[in-house]
Amino acid sequence: MPEDNVIFVGNKPVMNYVLAAVTQFNEGAKEVTIKARGRAISRAVDTAEVVRHRFLTDVEIDRIQISTEELASEKGEKINVSSIEIFLKRPRAATD
């Protein structure tokens, strides 16, 4: 999947990410991935749910991947950070 169909969720308001996802689907993307780490995970889940329930009701969750990434802190210690990838897709009938 091309990297331009990936939305990296950070600290901005949820509606910014919702708009990005809706725009990608409206431009013809068949699948959009929402990625987040740490505290932004709940914002990524909110983004996927708002897209599905309020804007594009034909969009489905294809799959969800969760993982843990090991990062180095400012002090040099290793810390574990959770991450999530939510794969949204539109059924064929809606895009053809």
From Swiss-Prot:
One of its GO terms (biological process) is chromosome condensation. The keyword Cytoplasm applies. The keyword Nucleotidyltransferase does not apply. Its main location: cytoplasm. Keywords: Chromosome, Cytoplasm, DNA condensation, DNA-binding. SUPFAM superfamilies: AlbA-like. Pfam families: Alba. InterPro entries: Alba-like_dom_sf, DNA/RNA-bd_Alba, DNA/RNA-bd_Alba-like. GO terms for cellular component: chromosome; cytoplasm. Gene3D superfamilies: Alba-like domain. It comes from the Archaea. One of its GO terms (molecular function) is double-stranded DNA binding. It is found in: Cytoplasm; Chromosome. Belongs to the histone-like Alba family. Binds double-stranded DNA tightly but without sequence specificity. Involved in DNA compaction. This is DNA/RNA-binding protein Alba. The gene is albA.
